[in-house]
Amino acid sequence: MTLEEKIGQMSQIDARRIGAATALEVRGFLISDSQGIDRHNLIPMSRIDDAVSRKSLVLLK
């Protein structure tokens, strides 16, 4: 299962946990915690929450 498929199967609660303790690289974007690893590639959690509310993560490179 790819990372994209796994994210697609997450519930809202699971998806909101992304970046809480770890960072995931998804198609060149970094989802990180408040420490940040590469701030130029961070996806704001508000954008993640918005995507989760639509039950869809669309990550553009």
From Swiss-Prot:
The yes or no answer to whether the keyword Glycoprotein is present is yes
**What's this protein's name?**
Furostanol glycoside 26-O-beta-glucosidase
Report the pH profile: Optimum pH is 5.0.
Q: Could you tell me the EC number(s) of this protein? A: 3.2.1.186
Q: How does it assemble?
A: Monomer.
Source organism (scientific name): Solanum torvum (Turkey berry)
The organism that produces this protein has a lineage beginning with: Eukaryota, Viridiplantae, Streptophyta, Embryophyta, Tracheophyta
Inhibition and activation profile: Inhibited by Hg(2+) and D-glucono-1,5-lactone.
Annotated positions binding D-glucose: 33
